[in-house]
Amino acid sequence: MAEAAAGEAGASERDPDAGRARRRLRVLSGHLLGRPQEAPSTNECKARRAASAAGASPAATPAAPESGTIPKKRQEVMKWNGWGYNDSKFLLNKKGQVELTGKRYPLSGLVLPTLRDWIQNTLGVSLEHKTTSKTSINPSEAPPSIVNEDFLQELKEARISYSQEADDRVFRAHGHCLHEIFLLREGMFERIPDIVVWPTCHDDVVKIVNLACKYNLCIIPIGGGTSVSYGLMCPADETRTIISLDTSQMNRILWVDENNLTAHVEAGITGQDLERQLKESGYCTGHEPDSLEFSTVGGWISTRASGMKKNIYGNIEDLVVHMKMVTPRGVIEKSSQGPRMSTGPDIHHFIMGSEGTLGVITEATIKIRPTPEYQKYGSVAFPNFEQGVACLREIAKQRCAPASIRLMDNQQFQFGHALKPQVSSIFTSFLDGLKKFYITKFKGFDPNQISVATLLFEGDREKVLQHEKQVYDIAAKFGGLAAGEDNGQRGYLLTYVIAYIRDLGLEYYVIGESFETSAPWDRVIDLCRNVKERIRRECKERGVQFAPLSTCRVTQTYDAGACIYFYFAFNYRGISDPLTVFEHTEAAAREEILANGGSLSHHHGVGKIRKQWLKESISDVGFGMLKSVKEYVDPSNIFGNRNLL
């Protein structure tokens, strides 16, 4: 098995001359095909490892040079028991008002004067009662690291950086599901990785997989760590050594091909680093999931991710031209970077959505576009959610959707309004009041029924303005009123700070989560209504004293349907086992989604949290096909995170 996994890189190690000949042929063929020359990865890996080990004693763990957003010691920059950066959090200031700390976001340092009242009134929260939680990881509470000494010795000889420290291992034992974060604050996981390894390139990954096969170890890959499907949780009964293979140091753009508008990147690069570096050359991918700051290209591929601007740029399956994955059987990749092939079932679709069960994605070629010259925000207020959905359906039918369009139901609109920062200008405050008066009094909109769509247009300026008029004309036919560019822009600026709200809630006995689905257009309204009602009913039956927050928004539109996001939260004071209540309610909501014609997931993936419904979602035969692929590619279950199957 280990020999099979070695692939071309392993053969090169055994026969250096043959390896050099193969690399020369590959480079030569690349020239003949007009493709960008790829630097010989093996030599580059050796150079990086040599640099990382300079000054280190042979017995020491090599300390590789770092770059990119995510350092090896993630806990130095990011929260170990919550979302995002250490310096950014919502808190109550000395005046009892909510503000966001730090300087990273447009909302940072600003006061949100109405959010406190909204939290109290909506969820029955008493701000005099705070929860207690651990302030740091206690190494003595972490399960001990058990690692084969022969494996460690070979890892050192390969000069691959690693750690067995408790804080490094705990940080990579989880994603960001409510259960995981709650457990971090209150206790400890039953099982965590035994060792964290940091490959710096494709060939390092090949060596790690070879060693795992040789010693029968379990590998769980991790990119940005933003999973919301229990995808990173270690199986409690796994007796083998668990390796957390952290791709964060594989974070380079290897080349940009301006003729074919593609970029070849390492899979550990984060979305924000990728977009920032491409922008320096005048390009972008346009792929912007809400987790853009921390999620990685490899993570996008392995979960079949979607970005908010998919209407222009496509989902991840539309963006990927080529990819490389290391498996226990060897390396999977196509021989051509052609834009489309008719060569049987597309092997890319075995890799996309595989969620770390087959191997490690190491590199990918993705489409890029010139950075748009013009960008404009907008918003539309509708009398109710139903008319808003009808408008979005018509926009999709006419295929004129802007880069992004999101429709909030009334409760989410109210929540968004509560996140509005304090206005310093009397004139601005007066204008806001005038707009509200016009919509509610003059136009007769009920404040408790209003639904709002936020819009983002981008591209050529003249075309954007034409496109904008077309969308607003359609909206008017469904009772929609233009609600201003500022409201639209604020809606999108909140994208990257919403996740921080949950951490504030946890301090005051509020637990919550978001989940998503996709559904045909004719099921959207019924599905939204029934799922929200099911959440309220389940909470009441399970002893939740205050009505839960149960809200939704339509976030993506397609010819044949839409993606819907749900948010729910409740005050758990007085409940002895809040996690059980929460998980039963979330499972009931998923059952309701499936009963109403929704999908198991649109882009979060299956992981372990939704795997119980996978067989009924894809049929017995489809499930058997997935199992057969797994059994062939990974017969010893080296990639043993137990997602999907």
Curated annotation (Swiss-Prot):
The UniProt keywords, alphabetically, are: Acetylation, FAD, Flavoprotein, Lipid biosynthesis, Lipid metabolism, Membrane, Peroxisome, Phosphoprotein, Transferase, Transit peptide
Give the catalytic activity.
a long chain fatty alcohol + a 1-acylglycerone 3-phosphate = a 1-O-alkylglycerone 3-phosphate + a long-chain fatty acid + H(+); hexadecan-1-ol + 1-hexadecanoylglycerone 3-phosphate = 1-O-hexadecylglycerone 3-phosphate + hexadecanoate + H(+); 1-hexadecanoylglycerone 3-phosphate + a long-chain fatty acid = a 1-acylglycerone 3-phosphate + hexadecanoate
* Its EC number(s): 2.5.1.26
Q: Name one GO molecular function term.
A: alkylglycerone-phosphate synthase activity
Residues modified as Phosphothreonine are 61
Ranges for region Disordered: 1-72
| Stored SUPFAM superfamilies | FAD-binding/transporter-associated domain-like (SSF56176), FAD-linked oxidases, C-terminal domain (SSF55103)
Q: Name one Pfam family in it.
A: FAD_binding_4
List compositional bias (Basic and acidic residues) regions by residue number: 11-20
Task: Give the subcellular location.
Answer: Peroxisome membrane; Peroxisome
Cofactors named for this entry: FAD
FAD-binding PCMH-type domain residues are: 189-371
Top EC group:
transferase
- Which positions in this protein are listed as binding substrate? 502
User: What are the boundaries of the region Important for enzyme activity?
Assistant: 602-604, 641-645
Q: What does this protein do?
A: Catalyzes the exchange of the acyl chain in acyl-dihydroxyacetonephosphate (acyl-DHAP) for a long chain fatty alcohol, yielding the first ether linked intermediate, i.e. alkyl-dihydroxyacetonephosphate (alkyl-DHAP), in the pathway of ether lipid biosynthesis.
Instruction: Return the protein name.
Output: Alkyldihydroxyacetonephosphate synthase, peroxisomal
